[in-house]
Amino acid sequence: MRGLDYKWIEALDAVVAQGGFERAAEELYISQSAVSQRIKQLERFLAQPVLIREQPPKPTPVGKKLLGLYRRVRILEHELIPELMNDDTAKPIQLALATNADSLATWLLPALKEVMTLRQVELNLAIYGESRSIEKLKSGEVAGAISLESQPIAGCKADYLGRMDYVCVASPDFYQRYFAAGVNYQTLRKAPAVSYDQYDDLHNRFLHDHFNISRDSIINHNVGSSEAFVRLAVSGIAYCLIPKLQIEQELASGVLMDITPGFLLSYRIYWHHWQLESGVLKEISQAIVQYAQAHLPQ
């Protein structure tokens, strides 16, 4: 019986990564019909579909498992073959990691600086909410993920990184305009806030836990940039929850103020990665864990 042909999975990976058959064909330097034929051969071999044919195409649950396997093999292959052939001219290894925006805006890049400087690696740092990033590791789309989840998925490890502490801040002018009567249920419902996106529930959780306010009771902007949060708050457009680590200078100078002193939102974050790691991927995991544990509150 013929075994699994990795060219079939390569075609599946290209279709998903490029968002369609035409671009996948260009990526693989084959015809579009050849890409389609390889996908059909894979589905015939497995006796089930591996691709949801919509726009853009998406892998089925079985397709996700195959992509996870394929991408792991590619990483190991990329590291092993140059070593066996004593070839130091190989292309950089490509790695995708899932992170939340706040980690990227604060401590993650300094943690990765040495590895990115010394090793041949191209990183794709994909931003997802803390509760969604683990799904990308399950599907094989990324080789590691920062998550709120403490329990590892099958075949992976979860290392504790530290605590992210959030403070609710605004500019002094904004505070006088909206909170002259104090920060309470009534005033918070009239003041504009900002969240990262519709999946960001940190602000909602904070308001619900401390003021019993629901999301649909407030004025809320969605801005997909942690750095823009700071600018919006400093310019007096909105109030928001921001990692304390990100705005220590603004708090010290008085440009921003903690409008709910004594109320802090904290959560623990974890680095999820494959149990069997080697080479640059192992170095990345070690760098992330060591730096975070040294610089984040424990």
Curated annotation (Swiss-Prot):
- Self-association and partners: Homodimer.
State the taxonomy lineage: Bacteria, Pseudomonadati, Pseudomonadota, Gammaproteobacteria, Vibrionales
Q: What is this protein called?
A: HTH-type transcriptional regulator ArgP
* A GO molecular-function descriptor: DNA binding
> Can you tell which superkingdom this protein's organism belongs to?
Bacteria
Q: Which residues bind DNA?
A: 21-40
Q: Which PROSITE patterns does this UniProt record tie to the protein?
A: HTH_LYSR
Q: Which organism is it from?
A: Vibrio vulnificus (strain CMCP6)
The entry's function note states: Controls the transcription of genes involved in arginine and lysine metabolism.
Which family is this protein grouped under? Belongs to the LysR transcriptional regulatory family.
